Amino acid sequence: MSDMRVEQDVLDLGSTGMELDVRRVNLLDDIEVREPNSMEIWYGHSILTATLFPPAQPSDDVDFVSKTNGRLEYMLEAGVTGDGDDRKRRFPFGKYPRLLMAWMAKQIRAAKGHRTRNVDPETKTITIPSIYQLCEEMGLPHGGRTAKSVQEQLELLLACRISIRASGTGKGLNVRDTAYLPIVQAVRIINDEKNVGYSGATFRLTDEVYERLSRESAPFDTRVSTYLLKGRSVMPYDIYIWLTGSMKNLRHDLPVSWDWLYERFGDQIAVKKSFRRMFRQSLEKVKKVYPGLNVECPTYEDYIILHPSPTSVPTRAVHDAEAAATDGVFNVAMRSLTSVQRNGVRKAITE
């Protein structure tokens, strides 16, 4: 993908007319005047739900993509999907893998260790009853084209493999530790040939992926992500997820080099000068929906500066969302208990 195309994607807000412009203004106003409710708070990981996935399908000669985070290197290898002669190795890419991983993190965090419609914490199993329902929960259109794209990206996501490497030196030795992480241990995908929207899936996450999504993910506002993903570029969204997660524990000014930023966010952008321009444009877009963000981009320096800022989602709103999730689990349990008391165990199980 050319730098010009990527840059246009960054600037593209997805507007096709007056109606979309009005919706966008209304969304910005809504973000400004109220905090997100429990349904609008999801959880993101700066790598696992964002930058690890390429913005577009890499060329056939690319074996893996990788991102570093301190001493850790995350590597993504494409999986094989399809049947018979249609089998092919492809990467999950674009916005849908990001939303799918964030949706999983939301379901896991909201379950709070209890079994729900979508999560069984004991077996670390995720259930998607239908693609239509999944699209609705992710705030996506219900049309057939969207449902087909989500289904395809879900299959690519579940087929890929992640590995995490840590290296170090000491006493004349080089040590490298590697953990191999297929996202799932087992998966069943049900395809409805007549209507893709009724397709679904059940899969068991690996312990490592489940734990990282449940413990290392940071809250974000889905109204913000909806705005940032309106265009074709995922860069504004990735920057937002990284920044709101970083601000949680930031107590002092933090310089971040342009080289580090390019490695993290510059996939498929060949010219660093173009990347800097696009990063600044994406950052300005993020600031529209994250007004408390304080990030400085000195004109003639080789770094940007993160100043301590509030997180995108206030702590109070997160606590309220967690309390609402606990109430929801309690209500499900009470309904099950009431059903047992009224109808007996056998009938309650079938409900």
Regions found by a protein language model. Name each.
Residues 1-351:
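Charged, alpha-helix-forming regions
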